[in-house]
Amino acid sequence: MKNKSVEMLIEGAKEWGIFLEMFHVEHFQKYYALLLEWNQKMNLTAITEESEVVIKHFLDSLSVVKSGKIKEEEKIIDVGTGAGFPCIPLKIVFPKLKATLLDSSKKRITFLEEVINKLGINEIELIHGRAEDIGKDIKYREQFDLSMARAVAPLNILLEYTLPFVKVDGYFIALKGREIEEEIENSQRALKELKGEIEEVKEIKLPYSDIVHHLVIIKKIDNCPTKYPRRANAIQRSPL
């Protein structure tokens, strides 16, 4: 990456209270290079310009620390991780996180295997599968301190895919856009059914841009009923 983009990354991260060393920067540079290389043969991201990737992928992912819920050595799962956002940037900065990245695309998982090998990232598991299936597996169900999703699905649908992974007293963090009030209003039934409650909604303004988004921080207050998550077609056809 060019010096200007590196400076944007370093200074932007400081706004989240993160102080990057040069080895962190080198990891982000390798990640960016791999993203560009693999994006030529598969659809990973429409955002490829250097400064845009820094702002809309790297700094956006790191903004999760503003939730106050990122703690070293905790177990986290990134549901529908895509090209690795937000979890790979978080693992670069917080290497002791015990991370699981879940995606339904085998091609994207293959890309992520290359990323973690080239970056030398440890304590990370990649799963090729669907959240509605893996969320029923006792190896993963209610095993995580924190789940995250940056997916574009409405919040009430995301909750059914993500909350079953979270331990009681753990958290789900949804990275959502500027307009969030209606989604929250439409998620009240899902929150009640899936045993979650909104603890806080944080407004985040991304550095070097006019982009505003929100972190919706949801606490798991009891075990999810075993009937959730339902099959994907049921979730889409009749969302909670």
Swiss-Prot record:
Subcellular location: Cytoplasm
EC number: 2.1.1.-
Keywords: Cytoplasm, Methyltransferase, rRNA processing, S-adenosyl-L-methionine, Transferase
GO cellular component: cytosol
Chief location bin: cytoplasm
Listed Pfam families: GidB
Matching HAMAP family: 16SrRNA_methyltr_G
Family recorded in the similarity comment: Belongs to the methyltransferase superfamily. RNA methyltransferase RsmG family.
Name of the protein this chain belongs to: Ribosomal RNA small subunit methyltransferase G
Source organism (scientific name): Thermoanaerobacter pseudethanolicus (strain ATCC 33223 / 39E)
